[in-house]
């Protein structure tokens, strides 16, 4: 058998990356895939004796919240996703991981790397996994961060006012997992440090007290994150960030770390031209299985916490579009300034897609900020049907010496 501890150093992340499409769950192709789509996949797991599927509780609106168990190992690992209903990226990746664990492949004749079979065997032999995908199904259906009660579940670890929050704490106390993965999405405009690099993936070993001390429980999380970061840096160099570690006494991640489970937070952000987050889904698949392998093999013990501390802190340094040094006419005034524009999503009720509405959010000196797209507009002026200003929709033309250079339509360059 190939030693996975050695294999990891030689590129387990590359093998997982190259193999993801084999295990891609084809019933889920968009972020807003809906509760029933996930239920259908979970019900399908019951056909395989590898999985024990049970209804852990019901949501406020009566939807089932499932607990999926697999593996026979001593080390217990619990993973939950979508405690915020509009944060689905990791749920998609978990569906792919279910396919990997049950060795459910696509219909291609593509040869499977034998290292993946060894990985699967090691994970299931050394670990017992507990998955809770879509912990907030009511929020997922309504496409909102909050539960049906209007409560942010990740601020309910103490008050326990939601059935979903009550379940999460009960599972942690009953199962006593050694390791936990708290899986979220974040605003896609966060940057990795004060840079123009979108923080496509961000990690955090959550703090368990106000002074953010590092005990053995939290140190293990930092070490695992180092390996996960190494796996995805190959594909998103300088686009991995570290979430702010300020202690939040009401949050589950902070409390679960305090209760003795090594807790790893993963936040999926933005990646250019990936509105449905299918590429970020792939990176979740790679990073999660890498992290699980490090737990199963205990390879994380070889990692240095210093590498975790070197990850750049997330910053809000990015807009969707920045137009620099453009000439603007407003009333009797003519001046040169930068424009910062964002396109904001709005869910369409009952549908699996979104509409977008652009807005000019800043006018002035944007030299310390970055745009996912940028235009250097020196010598250009804005021509628009209506006078532009803060809050205006970004519909206009950029003209230089009477010649049309760019058309901006709803915040996009055409």
Which role fits each region the language model picked out?
Residues 8-65:
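Short glycine- and acidic-rich boundary segments immediately preceding or forming the N-terminal edge
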Residues 56-57, 70, 81, 133-136, ...:
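Active-site-proximal beta-strand/loop segments in catalytic clefts of secreted hydrolases
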Residues 62, 115-118, 247-253:
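Alpha-helical scaffolding within the catalytic cores
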Residues 1-7:
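Hydrophobic h-region of N-terminal signal peptides that target proteins for export
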Residues 66-74:
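Short beta-strand-to-loop junctions in surface cap/lid or active-site-entrance loops
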Residues 74-78, 83, 87-238, 257:
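Active-site/substrate-binding loop(s) of hydrolase catalytic cores
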């Amino acid at each position: 058998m190939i030693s996975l501890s050695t294999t990891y150093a030689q590129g387990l992340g590359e093998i997982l990356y190259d193999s993801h499409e084999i295990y891609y769950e084809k019933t889920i192709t968009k972020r807003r895939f809906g509760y029933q789509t996930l239920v259908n996949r979970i019900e399908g797991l019951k056909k395989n004796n590898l999985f024990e599927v049970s209804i852990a509780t019901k949501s406020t609106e009566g939807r089932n919240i499932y607990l999926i168990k697999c593996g026979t190992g001593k080390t217990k690992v619990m993973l939950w996703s979508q405690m915020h209903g509009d944060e689905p990226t990791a749920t998609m990746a978990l569906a792919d991981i279910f396919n990997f664990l049950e060795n459910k492949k696509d219909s291609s004749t593509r040869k499977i790397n034998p290292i993946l079979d060894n990985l699967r065997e090691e994970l299931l032999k050394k670990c017992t996994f507990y998955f809770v995908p879509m912990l907030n199904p009511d929020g997922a259906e309504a496409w909102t961060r909050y539960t049906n009660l209007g409560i942010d579940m990740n601020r309910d670890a103490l008050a326990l006012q939601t059935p979903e929050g009550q379940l999460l704490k009960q599972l942690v106390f009953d199962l006593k997992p050694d390791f936990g993965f708290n899986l979220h999405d974040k605003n896609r405009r966060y940057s990795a440090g004060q840079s123009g690099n979108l923080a496509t993936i961000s990690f955090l070993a959550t703090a368990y007290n106000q002074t953010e001390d590092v005990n053995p429980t939290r140190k293990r999380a930092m070490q695992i994150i180092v390996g996960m970061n190494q796996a995805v840096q190959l594909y998103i160099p300088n686009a991995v960030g570290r979430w702010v570690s300020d202690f939040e006494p009401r949050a589950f991640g902070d409390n679960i770390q305090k209760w003795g489970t090594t807790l790893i937070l993963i936040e999926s952000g933005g990646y250019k031209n990936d509105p449905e987050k299918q590429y970020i889904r792939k990176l979740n698949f790679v990073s999660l299985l890498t992290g699980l392998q490090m737990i199963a093999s205990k390879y994380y013990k070889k990692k240095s916490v210093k590498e975790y501390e070197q990850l750049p802190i997330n910053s809000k340094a990015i807009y969707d579009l920045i137009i620099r040094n453009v000439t603007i006419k407003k009333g009797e005034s003519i001046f040169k300034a930068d424009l910062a524009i964002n396109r904001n999503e709005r869910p369409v009720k009952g549908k699996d897609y979104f509409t977008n509405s652009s807005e000019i959010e800043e006018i002035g000196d944007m030299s310390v900020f970055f745009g996912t797209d940028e235009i250097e507009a020196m010598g250009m002026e804005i021509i628009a049907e209506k006078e532009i200003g803060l809050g205006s929709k970004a519909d206009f033309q950029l003209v230089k010496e009477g010649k049309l250079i760019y058309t901006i339509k709803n915040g996009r360059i055409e």
